[in-house]
Regions:
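Phosphate-binding site of ATP-dependent enzymes
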Residues: 165-251
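Conserved N-proximal alpha/beta basic substrate-recognition cap immediately N-terminal to
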Residues: 21-132
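Glycine-rich phosphate/pyrophosphate-binding beta-alpha loops
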Residues: 277-290
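Protein kinase-like catalytic core scaffold
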Residues: 156, 214-215, 259, 272-274
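Extreme N-terminal starter segment of soluble prokaryotic enzymes
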Residues: 12-17
Length: 322
């Protein structure tokens, strides 16, 4: 069978889309890094994108890209919305990938990470240490889990299935603390509460880009919620080989080009992966590291764009029987 090369070609000049709901520090950082690399960024909100009908059926509609596709699509953020809105936004990303546009991170990765139950499953399947977790629709089943764990003095954390930055978390130490189904959108995501003990509320955020841990920070929480958005103090941290390898393996388990991996240590000293974020913010991390995170992200993003023309040509030749 004839094989064709997928070696990276020279970076073409052109424009790339950056999906972001509103301009912020991250968009300025990404924009500067893209311009420095010779790429013109076009910032779009998903609210202004969609699919447009015509004589040929339905086609992808991206403002400013009526005549050509973007070289690539960097997904900085997907704003909260209804189930239908989020489905449409992910559909746009799926369509871009089907059209051969490199999407960073693509819809498949975002779907795996935004749904905490899928993340937990993939981490477990990859053999990575992660806290025991239950995802249930039945209130009776959730109450049975809480009773069993409470009887063994193992508190649980109730998390929104979709959510980030520590919002909506609740510590469940007994059955009375479990809210009704309508308060959790009909799904109970329950995870073992992990603590080092002695009132030490801390965890680590490791930033992985292109399969490599490039920066990390230690977060000291004012409570058991250790997110920077919840007031945690962040400081520079140099992860050892074990933590680096764990973070890199977690990003690989979900297929992420870049990811923020949250790691915690239990009372026995074992490291556990709590979550993998496919659209992580990095402003807090940038304040405590010398690594130019936006430039590293853009370099990895552009390497995927450079590979795309050869990959598309190879696929076309294969379909043609060449």
């Amino acid at each position: 069978m004839k094989r064709c090369s997928t070696a990276p070609s020279a970076m073409p000049a052109g424009r790339s889309v950056v999906f972001i709901d509103r301009p912020d520090w991250h968009s300025r950082q990404l924009g500067a890094a893209l311009v420095k690399s010779g790429i013109q960024p076009v910032f779009l909100s998903f609210r202004n994108c969609g699919f447009a009908g015509g004589a040929g059926g339905s086609r992808l509609h991206l403002p400013s890209f009526q005549e050509e596709l973007p070289l690539g699509a960097f997904v900085r953020s997907i704003a909260a919305g209804s189930f239908e809105q989020v489905t449409l936004r992910l559909g746009i990303l799926h369509a871009l990938r089907e059209l051969g546009v490199p999407v960073y991170n693509d819809a498949r990765v975002i779907e795996r990470c935004v749904d905490k139950s899928t993340t937990s499953f993939l981490l477990h399947r990859a053999g990575l240490p992660t806290p025991p977790t239950w995802t249930l629709e039945s209130e009776a089943a959730a109450r049975a889990v809480v009773r069993a764990e409470a009887s063994a003095a193992r508190p649980l954390v109730l998390k929104p299935l979709f959510g980030s930055q520590g919002r909506g978390l609740a510590l469940i130490e007994n059955e009375a603390a479990l809210p009704p189904p309508d308060a959790v959108s009909g799904v109970y995501y329950l995870q073992h509460f992990v603590s080092e003990g002695s009132g030490r509320w801390r965890d680590w955020r490791v930033f992985v880009v292109g399969g490599r841990a490039i920066a990390a920070m230690l977060r000291h929480g004012v409570s058991w919620k250790t997110n920077a958005a919840q007031g945690a103090a962040c400081e520079a941290f140099e992860p050892d080989g074990q933590m680096r390898a764990l973070a890199e393996a977690a990003a690989e388990a979900v297929g992420a080009g870049f990811a923020g991996v949250d790691i915690i240590r239990d009372a026995s000293g074992r490291l556990l992966v709590l979550e993998v974020n496919s659209n992580p913010a990095w402003s807090a991390l940038q304040r405590v590291t010398r690594t130019r995170i936006s430039e590293v992200l853009v370099a990895d993003f552009l390497s995927r764009i450079a590979e795309a023309p050869a990959t598309r040509a190879c696929n076309a030749a294969t379909r043609a029987g060449g």
